[in-house]
UniProtKB/Swiss-Prot annotation:
Record family assignment: Belongs to the 2H phosphoesterase superfamily. YjcG family.
Listed EC numbers: 3.1.-.-
Name of the protein in its database record: Putative phosphoesterase BCG9842_B4061
Lineage of producing organism: Bacteria, Bacillati, Bacillota, Bacilli, Bacillales
Matching InterPro entries: 2H_phosphoesterase_YjcG-like, Cyclic_Pdiesterase, YjcG
Motif, HXTX 1: chain positions: 34-37
GO molecular function, one term: hydrolase activity, acting on ester bonds
Active site: 34 (proton donor), 115 (proton acceptor)
């Protein structure tokens, strides 16, 4: 089974991202806008309970925090992904580090850059044009974060929530 671990921002932030994703992200229909804590990984069904238990432990060790989302960035020239930048807080860093050690042994493909994807798979010309236009706009949002989610991928490629983990001691 394929799993991923994400934070979903507020509906307002998701709506803003989806307004752009409809046009610029071919994965728009597969998963709502999110901040990836751990990229998708394969696991055996019998490992799921251990993963869930580990995520409850990680959530209990992490305090709720404020998510700051703003400005548009890009991963070019590595790939033509456009995103809303997410401020890297100590809590986000801790969550990401905890999800890449211990039970989670998958190698990182990229350094952790918290972000909210708004476009991908664009040609170089389209990427440059859209990035130029979006960088002139003013985006800034913040919201409290008190949970993250374990997702699994369905046969049709869409992602759905398996379990939600509340941050802070006594919340799980």
């Amino acid at each position: 089974m394929k799993l991923g671990i994400v934070i979903f921002p507020s509906k307002m932030i998701q709506d803003k991202a989806n307004g752009l994703r409809k046009r610029y992200d071919p994965h728009y229909a597969l998963v709502p806008p999110h901040i990836t804590l751990k990229t998708p990984f394969e696991t055996q069904d019998e490992q799921l309970e251990s993963i869930v238990n580990e995520l409850h432990t990680i959530a209990g060790k992490t305090n709720p925090f404020t998510l700051h989302v703003g400005k548009v960035g890009s991963f070019a020239p590595v790939n033509n992904v456009l995103y809303f930048k997410v401020e890297k807080t100590p809590e986000l860093t801790f969550l990401n580090e905890e999800m890449h050690g211990g039970l989670f042994t998958q190698e990182r493909e990229y350094a952790f850059v918290p972000h909210l994807t708004i476009g991908q798979g664009l040609s170089d010309a389209e990427h440059a044009d859209v990035l130029g236009r979006l960088r002139m706009k003013d985006f800034y949002y913040e919201q409290p974060i008190d949970r993250f989610h374990l997702l699994y991928q369905l046969e049709n490629g869409t992602w759905t929530v398996h379990e939600t983990f509340h941050l802070g001691k006594g919340n799980n």
